[in-house]
Amino acid sequence: ITPLMWLVFALNLMGFFFLLSWTPTLMTAAKLPPATAALAGAALQVGGTVGSLALCGWLQRNRFLAISIMFALAVPVVGSIGFAGLTAQPALLLTATFFAGFLVLGVQSGINVAGAMIYPTSLRSNGSGWQLGLGRIGSIVGPLAGAQLVGMPVQNLYMWSAVPFALGAVICFIVHRLNTARLDAHPELREAQ
C-alpha cells in the first residue's frame, strides 16, 4: 500500500501545483482580463479551503473510497477550466476553479489523514513523512510539465492536467480495496484506525 500512497500524493500534488502555478497565466494568455485571471487563482484557493473544511467528516468516515470519488469528480471539473476560460462569462470560470480547488485540496486533506491511518501508531509519523516527502516530487513535476505543454490550446492543456486526477482515482480505489482486505484479515488493526 505504501508505494501506491506515494503515487497518490505525487499525482494530487502534481495536478494541484500545475493548477496553482499556471491558471492565472493561462487565463491571461486566453485573453481574459488580468483581474479575472487572478480571481480564478484565488477561487482555486478559496475552494480548497472550503472543500477541506466541508468534507472532513465525510472523508474521515469513508477514507479511501471518498478520496477516490473526489479524484474522479475532479477530472471533469479540472478539464472544464480551459473551456470555461474561453467563454465570455467570468462567473463560469470562477465556478470551475472554485470547485476544482474544493475537490483537489479536499483530496489532499483526505489523503493526509487517511494516508497516516494505514500505519500503526508507532510508524505513523515516519509513514506520513515519507508520503508527503515523496509526494512533493509531484509538486515539482506539475509546474514543469505545464511549462512544456504551455504552447497547447488552453482547453487541451486543462484536459491533460486532469489525467493525474484520473490516475489518482484508480490508484486510490485500489488502495481502498487493499486496505479493506487487510483490515478484514486483521480486525485488530481496525481499532487503531
Locations of the language-model features?
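Cytoplasmic membrane-interface "Motif A"-like loop-to-helix N-cap segments
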Residues: 60-72
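A late C-terminal transmembrane helix in Major Facilitator Superfamily
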Residues: 116-151
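Hydrophobic core of transmembrane alpha-helices in multi-pass small-molecule transporters
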Residues: 91-106
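C-terminal ends and interior cores of transmembrane alpha-helices
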Residues: 74-87
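Extracytoplasmic gate region of multi-pass secondary transporters
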Residues: 1-52
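Intracellular juxtamembrane helix-capping segments at the cytosolic ends
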Residues: 105-119
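Helix-to-loop junctions at the C-terminal end of transmembrane segments
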Residues: 51-63, 150
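Symmetry-related core transmembrane helices of the 12-TM Major Facilitator Superfamily/SLC fold
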Residues: 158-174
